[in-house]
Amino acid sequence: MNSVRRLSLVTDEIQPRRSGALRIAIATQDMKVLNAHFGSAKHFAVYDVSRDGWDFVEAVSFDDVSDESGKHPIEGEDRITPKVTALTGCHLLFCRAIGGPSAARVVSAKIHPIRVGEPEAIQDVLSRTQKMLKTAPPPWLRKVLAQAGVAEKKPFEDED
């Protein structure tokens, strides 16, 4: 049985995104460091990040997770769908690793997965994302921003 908990500061509903912000999810075991693979993440810290700063939105927690080898205690149990569903509304997903089938489902939910090689403090991930928004974002991020309605896509921009 998959179990999910939503911990938020104000309400138990999905909060509307702050105007001009990207909603990002960070895979974590301890709510302090980006240190989890997508499938084995016990928590996802969700933030709205804009050029001006960031706001904590919610923590989504799971009781039953895969180990980092991808093995499930109960074979055949779907552990991907509840996580993808819980991240609905996010634009970026930062994680240590993500398998092909999971990545395909995340992308089809219009969430851009970003693999980070080494553990990194959540505050550093937020700062780096904010810096990318303040400066000239790379083409892949401009595309995400346009799809999220955060920035207008100019007709002369490349689709790289």
Swiss-Prot record:
Q: Which InterPro entries match?
A: Di-Nase_FeMo-co_biosynth (IPR003731), DiNase_FeMo-co_biosyn_sf (IPR036105), NifX (IPR013480), NifX-like (IPR034169), NifX/NifY_domain (IPR051840)
Q: Is the keyword Cytoplasm in the record? A: no
Task: Please give a single GO biological process term from the UniProt record.
Answer: nitrogen fixation
Q: Which keywords does this Swiss-Prot/TrEMBL entry list?
A: Nitrogen fixation, Plasmid
What residues form the membrane-spanning segments? Answer: none
Q: Which domain of life is it from?
A: Bacteria
Q: Which cysteines are joined by disulfide bonds?
A: none
Keyword Hydrolase part of the UniProt annotation: no
Q: Which GO terms describe its molecular function?
A: metal cluster binding
Similarity-based family = Belongs to the NifX/NifY family.
PANTHER family recorded for this chain? IRON-MOLIBDENUM COFACTOR PROCESSING PROTEIN (PTHR33937:SF1), IRON-MOLYBDENUM PROTEIN-RELATED-RELATED (PTHR33937)
Q: What is this protein called?
A: Protein NifX
- The gene name reads nifX
